[in-house]
């Protein structure tokens, strides 16, 4: 399968590594300014969760291939920061690069807006479960064994089976939620609840330390669960039926103090979950999650005292 990845970011490159190892041709679409100094290869440290529940540490090399203009790919993965999705699609259009788009990112927009971004491209919505950071020519990442994928009926692309075959070949499983747009909103609301608690105590300068402080305190985690409940009310006010997402939301239904203790134990025991929490350190993205949910909550008149108090303490 021919795959293009937009940019050389952490998430796109982590999946690119998995696909390349499975024998697929993977190329990165880079801006002109980045093309000339793109590294030929990256050293990779990966906590790989595909084969063991605790994950395996892998040390490897990833070969970087840069995409040329006017080419056609089976799939083009776009894992970009909020606000840049439209721009990302424009870059592809400008370079006359064709293929089915896989949107692989957080957004607080409606399906109609996503369709406008895609324009004449076929597209499907998915959501990665990977994270990490990139420094110079080194990728330090975490990869879980599954990702979220829009169902075949809703996606309406002709090569859906090719995509699931690609995932299977890289030993990745997928889950199909009721509706991918709503699922992403819920995911953002949960993120906003957690990070607003973690970050309220100070600047987002050091997200890694904030995450560690949160994971080590069951009382902070209990408070995070209360903040998540408020954030979910915002999603509900947008017209989402939360009953359709029972499995995802189960942990936030039990009493907060019990859930807080359970979460603390889970973080202590599961290095995969712990590591992804500390590696999610994109300050802009964290702030965008909190800000989007909070502003919509205000517009829709949702009562959210905890979120409100937290947002006052957050600055980038």
Question: What are these language model-derived features?
Answer:
Residues 55-140:
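Rossmann-like NAD(P)(H) cofactor-binding subdomain of soluble oxidoreductases
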Residues 1-55:
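NAD(P)+-binding Rossmann beta1-loop-alpha1 motif at the extreme N-terminus of oxidoreductases
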Residues 112-189:
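Rossmann-fold dinucleotide-binding core
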Residues 181-211, 219-232:
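Active-site-proximal catalytic alpha-helix in oxidoreductases
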